[in-house]
């Protein structure tokens, strides 16, 4: 059976003059393959460097279905295909071919593919590239043939004429010999036909494929832009057949894959050389849309707003009156005679169905112009009435039958109003209407619209003139019949409607509706309104239609918008997974399957509208996340108390389920300070943590050179810009205000940094310095100089037993042995002996030795204290040395570890701040060069203003320039608005930074997690570019313990509340403890207070939820009127207004590293065995004191003796009378100057 089938599929091409014939050609299999990420191309000629660029154009969507076609010859010519059907061109084509024998030779582009229309041929004839646009007589099976490896025939077309484009590229030699083995070549092309140009893009990749289409990413470059100027709706491929003879040609193996381009948004990544290195199809899936929204290939964990959507209508409601009669247009248009123009006649048409398509599609009319309505829309409209006015005029006068025209016909015969709604239809009747017809050539006053004057004279003057119509006169003077159809808009029930069938009325669903020509989308519900009999529609205060009368049932219906809301994407971060969940905000899950436009999105999106993982929340419909009926600590807050988390293995999810789970948010999670019934967890141990917090306090200052940004060097544009008044001045004034605000923010924040001074201890009184006598008040344990003079001081290292020894010993040296201490199981004494101790122990030793002989050894017992105290002191020395050694080793090891961690911490902090500085500086540079950047979103750039002026007259040129100015002013206004918003955010951040500077740096905050994570110890500020960095040192709980707690304790009818802390119970008793650390204390009146009784009063806090304020809108028509009066370019597409790559600071990795370093630092805390410092003061012996006192007495006696021997005792105020040693002789004074004598007093 297979052999027979293969035989039927055998293809054979025989020679024919000019063309070849293929017999028994099988139908293409048209299998589908995925395009992967191929087909990206440079859609413009602009150089971009190191930037992410969003662009809207016709692209091949990623993972599109490509249709596969073959040139195939397998199994000894029994299995052959030669697929070259005519394919749809659409909005553009992606074409890829895998081959090895140069089978694909080119393409034919056109519409009808016959000689009635032009077609374009781009082919490779093995020596040249031929490009031609002609009327071709194309072959039914266009192909090339190769015989024995040499090009033989060109069976593409038989003849050509009316050629408008002919181009032959330089010669080359194509290898036409058939090859065996795998496919070696992958050639990709993109074809776009825009504005008369066929653009061709191409890339080549070497492959080694036995079959199929290779996955991957490819970028195509432009190679041709051909000015064909023809209509291209279809195309087909020109391929090659091969033979070892001169006939019976057969195909060789090749495959090509085609797909159509679609208008979509791509994000292209350019490197510093301007090369596209990566791309994202923004409509491929929610994650791709998110990447385009935030303009980043890497997305951090969180929930992001991406776009908006409106629920798609599921049905169409068409409601027209029940009218079946046909409108009598034939009687109007086929009348035997038309009246004179000054006596024009009117026919009212009503209660009928009007098929305007018969008129619109007629080829006999020379004029068919409509005003206020589109001819193609008439079939969908209804009117209260239609009036047909008929008359006869010259062909050249038809132009006067239009709104706002003047002339003899428009002024004195038939006048249309300026707001005319209707159509003017005219056709030549030179053969039918002959003879004399009349028109009014003069009238004292011009006619009003639709005014008719049948008089033939005015004040005795004959005002009518004659038309002499004959077929032989020039065309402009020949008879022309005119029918003016005036449409009366609905102010009463419709009586004239298009031939459209009505459908059933659908309520409470999102539908497309058409009521008597009023088209729209919304939800129809029964209304409580009451219309007057002549009223058909209702409008709200903003002039929007909000109600309608059903023309069949006459029921009043309210029209409300279909569900509309935002779309948010929940992602665990691209570094963790590509899984996402989608939240349709404020939408019921029943509406979600209809909210996605399936024709605009790929199947990857539609998967989120089906399946079991659909979760209705108060925030909207969450799809793509598994709902877990439990409460956990919130990871990604979604809203309305719902959170999401990503888990690879957890109790939150079972094997095989989605990685994203949704659950109800709890106040806390396991292993955290959480609340469960009346239990509370209180920390019992802590660890040190360092948190880095970067807070911006200013942004880069910018100003805009308005004239240069908008007009460049164009003088005409600058003059036109003056008409916009002080816009630019106000803009820069706003930017100046922002700059002043930044200076103010910086000043206020860093003004908080003050030098902290300590008050010195008071050491003098009344000018006398007692610091050497009195103890230092800041060091109450320190002795004064006098005390140090009067006592010998010995300082020893204390391993932990000397202090207790000193307290035991006191001033009694005899207690030395009794006060021995225990340390690590050993009895120890300090390695210190006073003279008294030495004398005592020496006396005991000598006595014991001397009496040992005659006390039969009993006296040797006196040697025991001496030996014991020596042994104990050796123990003390040993343990002290061991502790010192171990501590020294720990200090060395841990200090080295701490130093390395601190060094790494500083390096990490430096890297983070450097990254912050780079981003801020780059952004500032981008903002400061705003005046040099020219947006391309408004259709014209300032560099071509002179070209606009040269191609257009002054008025048209000013219109085009005005469009440019309007668009750019919108761009600048939006930019300044963004800056104002950012300035407000920075202001709030600066205020918070100032608060943290006061509370965290200059004080110790009691607020948990306000100054870092945990309980605050200290903070250090550091200036950063446009901000400040805080290094918060905190201690965080490392161990916790659950206690039963109560807000108050009721005792004897009174409620006792803790003054500070909380009441806790250990199971048997109640205590009071600090909230942030477990330190139980007995409950007393000092740490509690009594307030009220034991009754519990429950209060409800106001929980009113306010709806968003909706501004009162003016009339929509008035808004449009004001807009069109003040702006000549209402259709402004802002697009990517700023062109600024606003980089986002990402120092999370560095901060995580800092946290890890802080943890390591905390682990490196040195747990040394405490070595105290023991000081012992030893009193002098009695003979020292005796000598000291004798020396003082001797000094006093010698002083008195000297005074008496020198007769100076009188100076002691009469204490002795040894002479007048203090008396002075006045006569010994000699005058220095004559008449002057010095006196000493």
Swiss-Prot record:
Residue intervals passing through the bilayer: 1182-1202
Domain BetaCoV S1-NTD stretches: 14-294
Positions in coiled-coil regions: 917-961, 1143-1171
CDD domains: SARS-CoV-like_Spike_S1_NTD (cd21624), SARS-CoV-like_Spike_S1_RBD (cd21477), SARS-CoV-like_Spike_SD1-2_S1-S2_S2 (cd22378)
Any single biological process term in GO: receptor-mediated virion attachment to host cell
Region described as Heptad repeat 2: 1131-1170
Signal peptide extent: 1-13
All residue ranges annotated as the BetaCoV S1-CTD domain in the record: 325-499
Disulfide bonds: 19-139, 134-163, 282-292, 327-352, 370-423, 382-497, 808-819
Keyword Membrane found: yes
Gene3D superfamilies: 1.20.5.300, 3.30.70.1840, Single helix bin, Spike glycoprotein, N-terminal domain
Its membrane topology: Single-pass type I membrane protein
Motif (KxHxx): 1237-1241
Ranges where the record places region Fusion peptide 1: 784-805
Main localization of the protein described in the UniProt heading: virion
Region span, Fusion peptide 2: 803-823
Oligomer and partners: Homotrimer; each monomer consists of a S1 and a S2 subunit. The resulting peplomers protrude from the virus surface as spikes.
Protein name: Spike glycoprotein
Taxonomic lineage from the root: Viruses, Riboviria, Orthornavirae, Pisuviricota, Pisoniviricetes
